[in-house]
Every structure is written in C-alpha cells, then in structure tokens.
Amino acid sequence: MKFRTINEANVSGKRVLVRVDFNVPMSQGKVCDNTRLERHKETICALQKRGAKIILLSHCSRPRGKIVPELSLRPVAKALETIMGQQIFFVEECIGAPVQTAVEALQEGQILLLENLRFYKEEEDNNADFAEALAQQGDLYVNDAFSVSHRAHASVEAITHYLPSYAGMALQRELQALEKGLDNPKKPVTAIVGGAKVSSKLFVLNHLVTKVDYLVIGGGMANNFLMAQGHNVGKSLCEPMLMDMVKDVIEKARESHCTLVLPVDAVVGLQCETGTPHHHCMIEAIPDEGMILDIGEHSIARINTVIDASATLVWNGPLGVFEVSPFDHGTIAVARYAAARSQKGHCVSIAGGGDTVFALNHAGVADDFTYLSTAGGAFLEWMEGKTLPGVLALMQDLKN
C-alpha cells in the first residue's frame, strides 16, 4: 500500500487542508472527551513546524445536511485551544466568502477550524462541486482520519481530485498497524470476533476465515454457530433466518483450514440484567429457558491457549454481555491475558471498534495492546478486506 505522506510535501507558506475526525461527545456546549483531538496533534504540530497555514475539516454526528446549532464545532475549537496552547480561529461556514477571508488572513503556523461539514448535504453525497469549493481554500490536502476513510464523502474522496493529496501521521500510523494485523502478519494469526448480532459481521467472518489460522467467535453471535452445530441455546439471542449463511462460514473455514473456536461452556441466566440469578453449565446442557450471557471458565482457558499459539491477534467485539456485571468476566479475563502476552512481546495485538475500545478500557488494558483503533465502521470494513475509499483516493493520487 503506497501513498504520499506529509513528510514528502513542501508545506512552507502553503494553505493545507487537513481532514480530521473531531466527531466527539459534547454536553452543554463543551467537549466531554479529548481523545480524538489529541490523536491529530502530531500531524498539526508537524505542519506548524514547517510553516504551514492549517485549515481543519471535520464532521460531527449526523445533522443530515441541516444546520443543527448543538452540533456546531465551535466548542471543539475551544477545546483544541487548550490542547494546542494557542488561538484556534473558527468560521461558521465551510465554503464561501467568510471562509476565504479567514484563510487569507492566516499566518504561517496558525490554525483555522471550519464548521461541521455535514451541515452541507453535498458532503455525504460526495458532491464534486462542493469538493472543488473546499479545495479552493487550500494548496494541498491531508487525510489524517482513518475513522472516516470508509466514507466516499466530498472531504474524503472527491477533494483528492482537485489537490495534491497526502496521508497525515495518524492515518499513516493506523494503516501501518493494520498491515501487521491481516495484510502482512506474523503467523499464526488469531482473530477474536464478538458482539451481539452475527448479521452485522457476516462479511467480516467470511473474509477472516480465509486470512487467519484461528477464528474465535463469542458474544451473542456465537449462539448462531452453536445452533448450526445442533446445540440448544435456549432463549439466547439468535438469528435463525441466517442459519444457512452461518453454515456457509463454517464450511468455508473448513475449506480454508481455519480453526473455529466456539464456546464450550457458558454463564446462563433467565434475564440480561445485574443481579439476575445465573449459573455455569456446559454448552450441551443449556436449559430451554436459559440465556447465554457470558463464556465460561473452560472457554476462557481454551481461548487463552489459542492466544499462546498466536503471533498476531486481531480483536473486534466483546465475548459476553460485558455492559452488565458479572457477565463482563469472560471479556475481561481474555483481554488481560492477551494484553500480558502482548506486553511480553509474544504477540502483536490489534483491537478496534467502539465496543471493543470500551471493553478494553473497562478491563484496564487498552494501553497494553500493540495498537488500539478508535475507528468503528472503517475498522470493520478493513476486517472485511475492503479497500477504503479515502485510502484508495490517496493511492490513486500518487499514481497521477
């Protein structure tokens, strides 16, 4: 995967449009979590040191082409001032005369943040005219947002047709980490895929069985595989209408010599809530009225044995109903074991997706994985083997 990076760009005195992801939680006009702002600091500082005039582009939430005052990026500008230690200029537009005036006034090293891109319907339509209008404000373009690179949007894809385009440092670091996960990994490779519904990850599973040596399936989605193997799963979450597709994954795994690792025991209760009575049982003994809420100790031990045999681990999704104690135990136990292996240098560990990040933070080991991606949809599409539009655009720009 080859594309130009900002290290190759002459940015001195240039207007540099930087696509960032400042889609952050806000409450009462203030940013609640600066994590995503911090991720882009390295790229912004690198451009500053080399004399660039920096114009930041971002979306926030889903205003669907309408101006929604509570989704304005003005509070983000204030939060960014604290992080950067300098004034951040802000314009309540993305294109037009006010933006042009603000850009013309920028000095080298100064930063301008434009308004929420998704206040414009044309952004999500990948509209060429809107992309060209954005491009007129800059001399070159930098994509620093892996988390939006699965979107063929105007500020991600179409804009690259109008400006020389480069990868920022956060994007470059993410792609390098992911390459170690599935594209060019050390073997054996294990993928852990969990979550509630198998319907949301069938494409991921179909791709992974052709790429990994072991595929661990947990969470509610594992119930479908257990049912496909003839097990009773009681009242557990399941999607019977997808049974043929699940059986196809099982067959494809067999043909690809990928070992499927499914729960062999479980923690079972009658309801999915804190304080509900629960007990341990083997998969063969799930009661008709029971719900599988977490993996059991035998399953944890089996997964840890697979991790012991792995040089690369890719993880997306929890292994039980981790939001409800004590059904977070399986996810926490495996996460801590994987983190310890990674810290000792025994495996490269890569995890991603919103629930996964939350779960690993909950387990206290998020910082112990080799790489943790905050991207949700982009991470899943990478796991599906798709080439992301934002990354493809940078690769094509290099060819041109």
From Swiss-Prot:
Subcellular location(s) per record: Cytoplasm
Coiled-coil regions listed: none
Keyword ATP-binding tagged: yes
Primary residence: cytoplasm
Record: residues binding ATP: 201, 323, 353-356
Biological process terms in GO annotation: gluconeogenesis; glycolytic process
InterPro entries associated with the record: Phosphoglycerate_kinase, Phosphoglycerate_kinase_CS, Phosphoglycerate_kinase_N, Phosphoglycerate_kinase_sf
EC number(s) from the headed UniProt entry: 2.7.2.3
EC class name: transferase
Kinase keyword on record: yes
Gene3D superfamilies: Phosphoglycerate kinase, N-terminal domain (3.40.50.1260)
S-S bridge residues: none
This protein's UniProt keywords: ATP-binding, Cytoplasm, Glycolysis, Kinase, Nucleotide-binding, Transferase
Database matches in HAMAP family: Phosphoglyc_kinase (MF_00145)
Complexes and interactors: Monomer.
Similarity annotation: Belongs to the phosphoglycerate kinase family.
Protein name per Swiss-Prot or TrEMBL: Phosphoglycerate kinase
Source species taxonomy: Bacteria, Pseudomonadati, Pseudomonadota, Alphaproteobacteria, Hyphomicrobiales
Underlying gene: pgk
